[in-house]
Amino acid sequence: MLCDVYRSSKKADTYLYLPHGNEFTDVPDVLLGQFGRAEKVLTINLANREQLARLTVEKLQQHLHNDGFYLQLPPKREELQVNVNK
């Protein structure tokens, strides 16, 4: 399965994952308005992966299948502090 990743023009470190070739039809208009202009940053082949930076491929595929998209928000401040202290 291929997945397209888009970066938000309005929100830092915010990304939208869509099935490859999807035209944003499953993304709510309210979310698209807050997301701003979507800049495509990459296409990922999920077939040979188990883990992405912040979630498993299985979890991402569940979101894509059930919702038609996955919204990745910036990590919470506490998460950043824990990662720095490791």
From Swiss-Prot:
What the entry lists under Pfam families is as follows: YcgL
**Domain (YcgL) ranges:** 1-85
Q: Which superkingdom, per the lineage?
A: Bacteria
What PROSITE patterns does the record point to? YCGL
SUPFAM superfamilies in the record: YcgL-like
Record-linked PANTHER family: PROTEIN YCGL
Its recorded name reads YcgL domain-containing protein IL1825
Give the originating organism.
Idiomarina loihiensis (strain ATCC BAA-735 / DSM 15497 / L2-TR)
